Amino acid sequence: MLTKSAENKRNRKDDSMRPGQQLTLSIDHQTDFGYFLTDGEDTILLHNSEMTEDIEDRDEVEVFIYVDQQERLAATMKIPIISADEYGWVEVVDKVEDMGVFVDVGLSKDALVATEHLPPYEDVWPQKGDKLYCMLKVTNRGRMFAKPAPEDIISELFTDASEDLMNKELTGTVYRLIASGSFVITDDGIRCFIHPSERKEEPRLGSRVTGRVIQVKEDGSVNLSLLPRKQDAMSVDAECILTYMRMRNGAMPYSDKSQPDDIRERFNMSKAAFKRALGHLMKNGKVYQENGWTYEKK
């Protein structure tokens, strides 16, 4: 059983200022480098650099408690844009190999999104300028971590897509990557899915992508494609073929009779796409075929 003095000491410890708290404190006294604030028991420094407005005529001030660069408990009037109870979009400011990415939460110190909350492959980790939907966790030692929202949390932002979005372009932020595809949320809350077959490469977590709606689903979400429309792709593929031919003095040992594997290895396109592009070039009088070769018309 605790003695009265031991119980008071425990209660005092429970009530003491800790990193991660948002408190309203009284102004104790001013110094050249800031103000000392108090909760009636302990004092803490609010440095001039951490003030967002003049508090000379005030008795109390709302602050966030954190551990500064010198590992000291300190106060700031800059309130973080996310908290343990509130998720929000935060911007990536740095990426550290084998450690994670740091995000700006509105304080002079950034919060870490650890590797356990990031994809297994670093090439699809967020880069500077990308955004993640996170909450804030502050340890007793003052380390700040940002944790991306799980599906059940981010689903609170979802809105239903309308049928008239079919074939329209949507832009959004990649918020989840799994083996079966990429999930995106638009600024107005439409949930989008990109199957691996509808992209040339996997987008980064937190990056902005623009895709074409290829299906509006019954649950209000949509499927997106990041691939160009066939007519646009044909133009790109045709230019690729012409560029290759011009590197070989206007001739290449490929035609619409070439093997699919040979075409894919050389041009990174399917035989169907190759034939469409080649047909487009022949129709427009750019090339002709002869004995299994294709030649550029001069």
Curated annotation (Swiss-Prot):
The gene is yitL. Pfam families: CvfB_1st, CvfB_2nd, CvfB_WH, S1_2. It comes from Bacillus subtilis (strain 168). SMART domains: S1 (SM00316). GO terms for molecular function: nucleic acid binding. Residues 167-227 form the S1 motif domain. This is Uncharacterized protein YitL. Residues 1-17 have a biased composition (Basic and acidic residues). It comes from the Bacteria. PROSITE patterns: S1.
